[in-house]
From Swiss-Prot:
This is Maltoporin. The record marks 30, 65, 98, 249, 369, 427 as: Greasy slide, important in sugar transport. Pfam families: LamB. Residues 1-24 form the signal peptide. The keyword Repressor does not apply. One of its GO terms (biological process) is monoatomic ion transport. It is found in: Cell outer membrane.
Length: 428
């Protein structure tokens, strides 16, 4: 009984302490979850073309995912300030009530604004951070993302544009070798990415240009070395034009990457790898616009060619649209249509898939970006695949592309499926 009396007192004290700082703490985040079924039976399946780096997400997400961000301005004096930011992410298979998981510590950093007197308007930062990520929302595809532990200085005013400088790190699971007590030992390899960006270059009315250069290199520890065939380093160049139009925007992007920067094709480096020498060329156009009073539209079209020296690259085409009709300010209907085509450099065979989703949605506002949203959806997917990547269990070369044979199928084959369900999505 004594513990029962202490509990309300403790909660009262905690509530009082929290209320003191409640106005200063900022809570942001993202979350989605739901329930779905597959027409042929069982829980909801999700569909992604083999070789494609993403999928059309509406009515095609099978997990519960959340990012919970807490931040606070810790100090402010005039226009100078220090802001502390954190982000913890969770992902589970949404199959049970209790699903234990280890959270991912995605962000913890401090951002100091205007603390360098001779660089007014700039921000100095250090720590783990989502750093100026560029993505296509409708396919959940991050095409420029060097996020990770790092440090940098951004928003340096050059008059004609803003300059940003940063260095971040990502680590490969292996790749560095050494001899310890006469035994060969492999350890993880860190990769450093150095990022330079110019943004806000006004090139036409309502249009601006952002240019970026990323150099990534593997950084092996002392007494360890990389394989002599490792790619070691690489670079990625990005040019992105953003045009304000029709109550929204259009982004046209050209990217070129080499060697270690072609593993993820987004800005992370894998210089210890022995199979990523080559280049990547990406041409991307995407946006979201208002077509009429009751119509909004998202769209994407992309060409991506990853050419490997070991002949294990691929060429990926994708095109999709998501029109939205607004019945009221809080109710809408969405149709999501997407097509993927991926050709193997090694086998010269093609995998293709199209996916169609019809969703009835209730959302907090009349924009295609309005969230939270609750939607009921029905999805149909049809695919025809002729190649896939082997794994160690197959007895073939791990990660290498192979054509389907009469005795072994590497791909998903030729099939279709129907799913339906309900989902919420929120960001704040």
């Amino acid at each position: 009984m004594k513990s029962m009396r202490i509990l309300p007192i403790s909660l009262t004290i905690m509530a009082g302490l929290l209320s003191i700082e409640a106005s200063a703490v900022e809570f942001h985040g993202y979350a989605r979850s739901g329930i779905g079924w597959t027409g042929s039976g069982g829980e909801q399946q999700c569909f992604q073309s083999t070789g494609a780096q993403s999928k059309y997400r509406l009515g095609n997400e099978c997990e519960t995912y959340a990012e919970l961000k807490l931040g606070q301005e810790l100090w402010k004096d005039g226009n100078k300030s220090f802001y502390f930011d954190t982000n913890v992410a969770y992902s589970v298979a949404q199959k049970n009530d209790w699903e234990s998981t280890d959270p991912a510590f995605r962000e913890v950093n401090v951002q100091a604004k205007n603390v360098i007197d001779w660089l007014p308007g700039s921000t100095l930062w250090a720590g783990k951070r989502f750093y100026q990520r560029h993505d296509v929302h409708m396919i959940d595809f991050y095409y420029w993302d060097i996020s990770g532990p790092g440090a940098g200085l951004q928003d340096i005013d050059l008059g004609f544009s803003k300059l940003a400088l940063a260095v971040t790190r990502n680590t490969e699971s292996g790749g560095s070798y050494g001899w310890i007590a006469s035994q060969r030992k492999e350890i993880p390899t860190s990769n450093d990415v150095y990022d330079i960006r110019l943004s806000g270059l006004e090139v036409n009315p309502g249009g601006n240009l952002e240019l970026g250069f990323d150099y990534g290199r593997a950084n092996a520890r002392d007494h360890y070395k990389l394989d002599r065939h490792a790619s070691k380093d690489g670079f990625m160049f990005t040019a992105e034009h953003t045009q304000s139009m029709l109550g929204g925007f259009n982004k046209f992007v050209v990217q070129y990457a080499t060697d270690s920067m072609t593993s993820s094709n987004s800005g992370h480096s894998e210089g210890a790898s022995v199979n990523n020498d080559g280049y990547m060329l990406r041409i991307l156009n995407h946006g979201a616009i208002n077509l009429a009073e009751k119509w909004d539209l998202m769209y994407v079209a992309m060409y991506q060619d990853t050419d490997r020296d070991n002949n294990n690259g691929n060429t990926w085409y994708t095109v999709g649209v998501r029109p939205m009709y607004k019945w009221t300010s809080t109710m809408s209907t969405l149709l999501d249509i997407g097509y993927d085509n991926v050709k193997s450099q090694r086998t010269h065979d093609t995998n293709d898939q199209y996916k169609i989703t019809l969703a009835q949605q209730w959302q907090a506002g009349d924009s295609i970006w309005s969230r939270p949203a609750i939607r009921l959806f029905a999805t149909y997917a049809k695919w025809n695949e002729k190649w896939g990547n082997a794994n160690k269990k197959d007895g073939y070369i791990d990660g290498m592309a192979y054509r389907d044979t009469a005795t072994h199928k590497f791909s998903r084959g030729d099939d279709d499926e129907f799913t339906f369900g309900a989902q919420f999505e929120a960001w704040w």
